[in-house]
Amino acid sequence: MEKCTKSSSTMQVEPSFLQAENLILRLQMQHPTTENTAKRGQVMPALATTVMPVPYSLEHLTQFHGDPANCSEFLTQVTTYLTALQISNPANDAQIKLFFDYLSQQLESCGIISGPDKSTLLKQYENLILEFQQSFGKPTKQEINPLMNAKFDKGDNSSQQDPATFHLLAQNLICNETNQSGQFEKALADPNQDEESVTDMMDNLPDLITQCIQLDKKHSDRPELLQSETQLPLLASLIQHQALFSPTDPPPKKGPIQLREGQLPLTPAKRARQQETQLCLYCSQSGHFTRDCLAKRSRAPATTNNTAHQ
């Protein structure tokens, strides 16, 4: 009776260890080749610290639930175990599926992961490692690149591009924040900058008005210039015709039209305008008197404001 009770107690104490042995036996039965035997020999490569085999770690998973150091050691062993298999497509491999089935059952029993959905086992394992790193603040050095790059859809390389894209976006965000903060600090340090810019605009207003007057004068004089340009060839041909028919006749002393070299004929409208208007003494432009100069009017309030401000 004592032997029977002892045997029954041992059966109750080590159920997960027997499950781990059954897992290894199933893996050996499914892959009885020499290549797999060589892989089984190097399932757990030697680490710098003393490492327990993976089934033994899986058996004691309930003890690692509250101890960060033991949990870190366990995750390192699991990652090393999966990396040592050197499988090109872990999502469709039988060994990986069996291992994650067992891992999912153990994690679900400990309350770490809920739901043994086989289509998301790889994603659940990645989330477990990320949550562990964030909770303790010290990321473990793990070789998880084959698992992180593995996708259920073949030919999908977006997982390799996402980290680089996220890194570039983070750098651009930091640069934009730095530039904006620098501009904001400059604006706070120099609050009179806006007032100076407004004052500069008010000081330049007379010059702008003078330029507008010059442009308006050019546009107003353009039809007269065009009219004189059209009359010049006719006058030149008329003079040449008179010289051919009467070369010996002396020129008249007084004529209605007298042209010099390089001088355009003066139309009656232009002559009347020159007689009536004088140059402005303020902006040196014609077409208005000094008392009506817009530049003088715009500069006068600015001068009075500056004297009052001083």
UniProtKB/Swiss-Prot annotation:
Keyword Zinc-finger: yes
Job of this protein: Involved in cognitive function in the brain, possibly via the noradrenergic system.
ZnF endpoints (CCHC-type): 278-295
Gene Ontology terms for molecular function: nucleic acid binding; zinc ion binding
GO biological process, one term: cognition
Primary gene name: RTL4
Organism field: Homo sapiens (Human)
Record bears the keyword Transport: no
InterPro entries for this protein: RTL1-rel, Znf_CCHC, Znf_CCHC_sf
Organism superkingdom: Eukaryota
Name of the protein described by the UniProt record: Retrotransposon Gag-like protein 4
Lineage of origin: Eukaryota, Metazoa, Chordata, Craniata, Vertebrata
Keywords of the record: Metal-binding, Zinc, Zinc-finger
Miscellaneous: RTL4 is one of at least 11 genes called Mar or Mart related to long terminal repeat retrotransposons. They do not correspond to functional retrotransposons, but rather to neofunctionalized retrotransposons genes.
Family annotation (PANTHER family): LDOC1 RELATED, RETROTRANSPOSON GAG-LIKE PROTEIN 4
